[in-house]
Amino acid sequence: MNIKDVKTAIKVGDFTLRKHHRNKIDIKYLPNLDKKILIDNLARIYLIIQDGIIKKIGGSTSKGGIKATMMFYVSAMTGSPGVPRFVVHLLIERALKNKSRVELFMITSPRTLATVNGLFGHKKVEIASFKEMEDLCKSDYYSREKKYPDWNFQENHKSYPPDLARKHNLYHRKRLNKK
């Protein structure tokens, strides 16, 4: 699906290659974008776009906004990354090396007032749930394409590219041997 078909997303940046760094990619956020948008704690859906085509749909409510959410992808060559972020990091790197344009778009929804149960009763609080938004976005995509975006491996019940899954295993083996 082309990003042009999406009516609710805003572009927030472009992925770039990093030189001489463990992490192979970075994001250049749009300079004219209000910085508050990048760090706002609203529930958010992110769309990773390659040459105009949606490749990945994900969601988050992590503190620190879209910048914090994307740090999991940008810094996937350090620490103890899971397979999905590690592989997507390398897929973005591969696309950029092949001269593709890889962009980041975001969809947010306002917080809503809801009654939430605690241990001793309930209270009205503002909530920002991304899961329903993410599910709707994936469902909308599926209704048009009859599959999920290519990099949503789990939803598509597909294996990760074998070469990249091997790199993930090697990365963790090396990391554990250093301890």
Segments predicted by a language model, with ranges:
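Boundary/linker segments flanking structured domains
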Residues: 1-43, 47-55, 61-179
